Each structure stands twice: as structure tokens, then as C-alpha cells.
Amino acid sequence: MTTATAFEIRTLTPHPTLEYWSVCKIEALFETPFLDLVYRAAQVHRENFNPKAIQLSTLMSIKTGGCPEDCGYCPQSARYHTGVEKQQLLDVEEIVEKAKIAKARGAGRFCMGAAWRGPKPKDIEKVTAIIKAVKELGLETCGTFGLLQDGMAEDLKEAGLDYYNHNLDTAPEHYGNVIGTRQFDDRINTLGKVRKAGLKVCCGGIIGMNETRKERAGLIASLANLDPQPESVPINQLVKVEGTPLADAAELDWTEFVRTIAVARITMPKSYVRLSAGRQGMSEEMQAMCFMAGANSIFYGDKLLVTGNPEEDGDQRLMAKLDLEPETEENRYRAE
């Protein structure tokens, strides 16, 4: 069992309010007939959220490339030749201008990513200044800066950060096949520091990295058994980038991705489930099925860190076709 202060993967000990999800139980959900599974997930979604409201987030890379990690999916690793140029941390003014544009286009949350294994104390000083400036615009803020040292999460919280993104990436059993420079437990430990500091958690994973269905179930089990569950769960479809070890990963059938969205919704009923990276390669019909299966958040903007994303006009047209609307204070409903 892996534990971390204030945030842990639960054991089989009954919890007073949250259900324990075994891998076998989640595998059984995956085996549910497709339309029955989507229908069940849609019911759970409607019990907990306004099904027409989609939370819009914009993601910006504020420090690009040169990461020392060896994540097999990531074009920002310094170990791979992917054409991504290393850039230093951007100036506050440039980031604030991008945040203003994001807000004007309807985003309610501004997410900032930095390609570090983990920030140094001097980096935290700069990042906290950025967070304060973005918060002054009236946006929610989210940061993904890697593994945190003691005290850093508290500094981020004090600066006004709302969410910290730290994905589990994949199941514990598959982790070593994808990443060799850190351990699954390292992720759990940083999540513990984030929770202890009082930050909200954004934590999900990537689908399509040659994992088995059982390993997909293992990822969802790891997420659903975090106590408390993440407020936001981004489900990414692998974006294959030439030069990375996973550039030739096997294709994942679209129904398997929709199944994963549905299972995430059923097992984490009160979490926002974000349809995240990989949308550029999805048809409108596939995205519609994901929304039906319980996805209620997207990244909005033409770029996700260093990979593509659907154009904003295209997202607006799709949402209009599906009678969906951006989430606001007025249309937000979330069950307690």
C-alpha cells in the first residue's frame, strides 16, 4: 500500500462515504455492453452536474522543453529528438496577456505547465508572482510543475493557486514500461503535499500507451481510490509524436476511449472529467459520445503545451450542435 500525508490510496477498509473500487470491479464495468455503460454513466452525470454545462480551461506552456525525465509519451523530454526547442520560463507580462485572451474567449480556468522534473526554490519565487498576476484577472488558476519539495505547495496556495495538476499517467503495473526516471509512488507523495496545503487536485492519466484493458482499469482504480477523489480528472488520449518511444504505439479503438470516460464518470461521480489531449484526432461524433458518457470539461485553445488542439471556432460550433454551453456561475450545478 502506498500512502502520503492527507492523501492516500485507500485499502479494503470500508470508508464512510466513498466506495472502494477494486481493479476486478472496474474491469467488470469495462465489460458492460457499450450502450448500457454509456447510459449508466450519463445517469450518474445528470445526478451530479448540469449535463449541458462544459467547464472550459486554457493550457499554456510557461517553460518549454529540456525536461530531464524520460516519459515515453512526452516530446518535451531532453532525451528525445522531437523538434521541441528548449525555452526558459516566460515573463509575467507575456503570460498575463495570454490569460487575458483566454478569459475573453470564455475560459474560466487558466492552466500553466512547466517542463521540470520539479521546480527549484528560485523557480517557485517566479511562479508565485505569475500566479498572483493571473489571479488578479478573476480566473481560476491551475499549475503543473512536477514533483514538489516540502513547503512548495504551501507557497503556491498562498500565492492564490486553485488547482495543482499531477497526473498518475498510467496504472502502477504499467508505469515502468512508460517512465523510468521516477516511480509511481513519487506522484502519490507529491499529491499528498498538495492536499495537505489545501489545494484542489487535478489528476488523471493517458490512454493508448500500449496498456491492456486491465491496466486501464488499474489507472481508474488508482484515481477513484484516492481519498479524497480528485476534483478534476483529465483523461488524455495519447498524442503520438515522432521521436518519442511511444510514437508507434498501437491504435486504440475509439469505443475503448469512450468506455474509459464512462468508467471514470461512474467511479468518480462528483469529479469534473476532462476530455483532454488528443481531441484534435477525434471526430465530432466521438467527442459527442464522450460528453454523453460524462465528460464535462475540455481544454479550450489551439494548443496544449506543445501539441495541437481543436480550433476555438470548431469547439464553439460543436458545442452549439450539441446544445452545450460554457459553464458559468449561473448554470453551474454540482451535487454536494
UniProtKB/Swiss-Prot annotation:
Species annotation: Pasteurella multocida (strain Pm70)
Family affiliation: Belongs to the radical SAM superfamily. Biotin synthase family.
GO biological process: biotin biosynthetic process
Annotated positions binding [2Fe-2S] cluster: 111, 142, 202, 274
Protein name, per record: Biotin synthase
Pathway per the UniProt entry: Cofactor biosynthesis; biotin biosynthesis; biotin from 7,8-diaminononanoate: step 2/2
Enzyme class: transferase
GO MF annotation terms: 2 iron, 2 sulfur cluster binding; 4 iron, 4 sulfur cluster binding; biotin synthase activity; iron ion binding
Assembly notes: Homodimer.
Keywords: 2Fe-2S, 4Fe-4S, Biotin biosynthesis, Iron, Iron-sulfur, Metal-binding, S-adenosyl-L-methionine, Transferase
Catalytic activity: (4R,5S)-dethiobiotin + (sulfur carrier)-SH + 2 reduced [2Fe-2S]-[ferredoxin] + 2 S-adenosyl-L-methionine = (sulfur carrier)-H + biotin + 2 5'-deoxyadenosine + 2 L-methionine + 2 oxidized [2Fe-2S]-[ferredoxin]
Keyword field contains Cell division: no
